[in-house]
Amino acid sequence: ILDIVHERTIKTKKASIETRMAKTVEDRLNMYRMRYDIISDKIEKSIKKIPKINKIKWSPPRRNVKKGEEEVGLVLSDLHIGHSHSLEETGNISEYNTEVFVRRLHGLQKSVSDIYELHSNLYNLPTLHIFCLGDIVDGSNAAGAWSPVYIDTPVYDQLMLGFEHLSQCIEYLLTVFDNIKFYGVRGNHGRIAPSGVEKDYANWDNLIYNMLRVKFSENPRIQFNIPKTWWIMERIKNHNFLLVHGDDVKGSGNAIKNLEKFSTSMFGILKEKPDYTICGHFHESTELTSNFGKMIINGSFVGADVYAIKNLHKFSRPEQKIFGINNSHGVTWRYDLDLEYDK
């Protein structure tokens, strides 16, 4: 009997404790609810006391109202006229030949005029800067290890094709822009002899550039800058542009980081800081912004060729860069022109 009484006493105490615990939990929940209600009431009152802010609505600008002037930069590099590889050789991944080059150049022209039509609604765009960064030709078999089995056009014909089609391209762009400034930097594929046999500027690219200069010599709307150096530093709209082909950008690994190191070294040599360092050569369209400035690597007309796919295990689209240049902000809008897209 005593055990039964003891057990009942324990159960009664447990029940009492559980009741008190439940009440304590409920009291706490009620306390938190009241706190939340008080806070909510205060927030609601505060919101109602906030002064109303006039709504700002966007309204379209009046037609023909422009915001000043910008200039346009078009990067041309790595056309590799004379190079040839087929879809069969790349497993249906890529092809390139003279016909493809011409088609892509015409597509580029159309893209440039389309972009001009778009951005000229906002700014006056009187001047086009053509940054021609080399490897216009694919080169001669004896001048370098260019995989001669993938060159199907003699270098003389490469030269004439480059001159003919770049002339036509410039003539077309002169119908779009008031003025053109052409900058010619040679590439490594254009050298006329193996490295070290002739001076660096003895280069098929330079010959094409100078043929263009002679052709347009009586046209005051186009200017040419074709130095014997392998680089150009040009000040455009209060910003310095350092132009190189890219074969002198040394280092293993990341090309864009190596370009940054090159830009830093050139600053030490030239005692003038480049705001933008632009190169080609690597056949990959990429950019890097650092504390030092902006690095820009242009794409190529070729895209992924047999060497890139087989040896480097890389794929890249055929692209070229175009951008706006503002007096205050430097490079503003920019596009990678997809040359594979039929215009």
Identify the function of each model-found stretch:
Residues W58-L79, L87, G91-V214:
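Core catalytic region of metal-dependent phosphoesterases/phosphodiesterases
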Residues I1-L122, N327, L339-K343:
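Basic, amphipathic N-terminal segments that precede the first structured/catalytic domain
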Residues L174, R191, A202-T229, K237-L242, ...:
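Conserved beta-sheet core of the metallophosphoesterase superfamily
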Residues D27-D37, G91, G144-A145, A202-D205, ...:
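A broad, low-specificity signal for short, low-complexity segments enriched in glycine/proline
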Residues H6, H80-H83, H106, H119, ...:
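Histidine (H) residue identity feature
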Residues R8-A22, V176-P194, N238, L242, ...:
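N-terminal short leaders/motifs
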